[in-house]
Amino acid sequence: MAKNKTNKIEKKPIKITETILRDAHQSLIATRMTTEQMLPIVEKMDKVGYHSVECWGGATFDASLRFLKEDPWERLRKFRDGFKNTKLQMLFRGQNILGYRPYGDDVVEYFVQKSIANGIDIIRIFDCLNDLRNLQTAVKASNKEKGHAQVALSYTLGDAYTMDYWVDMAKRVEDMGANSICIKDMAG
């Protein structure tokens, strides 16, 4: 915790990110909710006071195209129109972007640029193996585009994952240029 000039601990507000528009239907029904099924709740969610809503990225892009026959960019723009007071966040698979294989730096940079231009404020960037090399390009591109680069460290258990490991990872992520750090516990 940070201390001010009088040596008192400064309290910072807790900021809450709601992930239901991405993670809930990704986890429960294979990302099959259409944009039109989600839009009716957007105005109410916008009034709650969330810091951000994670509504894009992960499997949503692929499912929109392949199974729902929707334009994922149009979905993002509709969310941006509906969330007037809430930041929009996406889940970004590092060098894999939103896909299932690594892409070149130029593709990562372009995708980040287009995501921010179409309404994303915060890009939550992760690599499932915590290989920080796979995060660097997306962090740098997010910062270049004036987006918020949030690095999510993938939490796991095991003898190698000591408190020193997590502290070291956080320091390296900070040095990389991340605007914030998140612990992503995918196993729950």
Report residues per predicted region.
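Acidic, glycine/proline-rich low-complexity segments that act as flexible tails and inter-domain linkers
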Residues: 22-26, 31
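Alpha/beta enzyme core
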Residues: 11-16, 30-60, 65-87, 96-188
